[in-house]
Amino acid sequence: MLAKRIIPCLDVTGGRVVKGINFEGLRDAGSILEQARFYNNELADELVFLDISASLESRKTTLEEVMKVSGEVFIPLTVGGGINSVERAKDVFLHGADKVSVNTAAVNHPELISRIAEKYGSQAVVVAIDIKKIGSDHMVHTHSGKNPTAYEALEWAHKVQELGAGEILLTSMDRDGTREGYDNDILARVSTSVHIPVIASGGAGNLEHLYEGFTIGHADAALAASIFHFRQYSIRQAKQYLRDRGIEVRL
């Protein structure tokens, strides 16, 4: 069985790490480089760097920041935000990213997923899916959660898999920053209906939530921010807790 991964996420805007609730009310969560160094030393399996205002502001991810982070970490680095072309993905890879995360641009131009996958391999393409419950449906949103789309979560997950995505980053906007736990219902439905890895995101508030994301949500990896940024728990603590509960992790 493949080891489950713990992935801290750096939501970045204005040159700082930030964290909000339900994609709103952002507060400062520290220096980008200090957080990156911390997670590199803390046995994080990977690191995600998301420029959360790039698509909203119709601009590109700051390559200088990506290069600085990539120079500080020796774990796989996924970069997202404003990646809307193969050329832009190339720039991000050249500045040290191991994977790119596409979201808004993938919805607007689904062929972008295939084009990046064909050039760099599916393993280098993460499709971020931001979902919000509307009625009984989990609807996909773009532009940092501002714009609803016509896609339902399962429908879009299947489509991105067919287009060549190597991984899905599934974020519940309803749970984001609430520390109430992942939305394990939709997480399990997506995870069990696709054959590519699914990363749980949005809502981790304690170590039991990570465990539930793996056991109830069937996630392949758990992404978290608040519980690690503000040092509520260390990643070493999280991994030991999971190992003690029978979850295979790298320690």
UniProtKB/Swiss-Prot annotation:
GO terms for biological process: L-histidine biosynthetic process. Keywords: Amino-acid biosynthesis, Cytoplasm, Histidine biosynthesis, Lyase. Pfam families: His_biosynth. One of its GO terms (cellular component) is cytoplasm. Pathway: Amino-acid biosynthesis; L-histidine biosynthesis; L-histidine from 5-phospho-alpha-D-ribose 1-diphosphate: step 5/9. GO terms for molecular function: imidazoleglycerol-phosphate synthase activity; lyase activity. It comes from the Bacteria. PANTHER family: IMIDAZOLE GLYCEROL PHOSPHATE SYNTHASE HISHF, IMIDAZOLE GLYCEROL PHOSPHATE SYNTHASE SUBUNIT HISF/H IGP SYNTHASE SUBUNIT HISF/H. This is Imidazole glycerol phosphate synthase subunit HisF. It comes from Chlorobium phaeobacteroides (strain DSM 266 / SMG 266 / 2430). The lineage of its organism: Bacteria, Pseudomonadati, Chlorobiota, Chlorobiia, Chlorobiales.
